[in-house]
């Protein structure tokens, strides 16, 4: 049985996505009332944010926070099992928005999850490639950048890990990024410098959807990132794309995905 690494807080609600605006705001219909939630995902969330789609929101732990909800999960790929429990969502023709037939699933879109997930999974000893490391520092500055994870151990070089959230899948291939990412490109360049200095560097891709069977960079979306991805891999940067199992209770670590060839 897989161990749950991250649990969602009590008080989560499921509603219907209405719209996204000003990049960080989403409107969601919950119990017949439209609420405003925060999304920290700066990507496009390509193919996910369709009007009427079920979404899961988590409540703010700080009662004084301006926006009391955070977008955590988006349903995709098929009919939601408790469709009749959600508020009806009229479409432009006046009917109710239909959903795809087939088996649907949740997609995790909270971009704060990957580095938190990595730290907890590391502390639980779930990554064979981190054997020999005992200390996990987060948000460590190096050069002009700040990387998610820096691992330390006795007699081993430091291991720097940058964590990325993956929500895009095409033809069973999980792809990153889902929009041009200059920040992601900068991180790859920083990882290359780390390798050149004699330390270890890796990327942890948190694939938060079940239909990704392989992993690769999104060449059609960000060719610069893709070129740098293959360059740093050849240089020695380690690539670890992991499938993350998702339920409305929480997240657990699945298998590592095969990497497509260049």
From Swiss-Prot:
GO terms for molecular function: DNA binding. Gene3D superfamilies: 2.40.50.580, 3.40.1350.60. It comes from the Bacteria. CDD domains: SfsA-like_bacterial. InterPro entries: SfsA, SfsA_C, SfsA_N. Pfam families: SfsA, SfsA_N. Belongs to the SfsA family. This is Sugar fermentation stimulation protein homolog.
């Amino acid at each position: 049985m897989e161990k749950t690494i991250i649990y969602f807080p009590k008080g989560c609600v499921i509603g219907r996505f209405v719209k996204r605006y000003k990049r960080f705001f989403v409107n969601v219909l919950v119990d017949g009332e439209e609420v405003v939630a925060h999304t920290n995902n700066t990507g496009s969330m390509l193919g996910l944010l369709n009007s009427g789609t079920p979404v899961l929101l988590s409540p703010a732990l700080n009662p004084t926070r301006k926006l009391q909800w955070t977008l955590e999960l988006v349903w995709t790929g098929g009919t939601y099992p408790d469709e009749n429990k959600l508020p009806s969502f009229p479409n432009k023709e006046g009917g109710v928005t239909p959903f795809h037939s087939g088996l649907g699933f949740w997609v995790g879109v909270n971009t704060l999850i990957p580095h938190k997930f990595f730290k907890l999974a590391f502390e639980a000893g779930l990554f064979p490639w981190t054997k020999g490391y005992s200390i996990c520092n987060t948000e460590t500055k190096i050069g002009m950048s700040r990387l998610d994870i820096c691992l330390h151990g006795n007699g081993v070089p430091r291991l720097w890990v940058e964590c990325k959230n993956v929500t895009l899948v095409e033809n069973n291939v999980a792809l990153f990024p889902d929009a041009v990412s200059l920040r992601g490109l900068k991180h790859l360049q920083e990882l290359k410098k780390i390798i050149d200095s004699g330390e270890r560097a890796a990327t942890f891709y948190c694939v938060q959807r079940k239909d990704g069977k392989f992993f690769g960079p999104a060449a059609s979306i960000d060719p610069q990132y893709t070129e740098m991805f293959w360059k740093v891999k050849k240089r020695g940067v380690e690539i670890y794309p992991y499938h993350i199992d998702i339920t409305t209770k929480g997240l657990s670590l699945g298998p590592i995905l095969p990497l497509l060839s260049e």
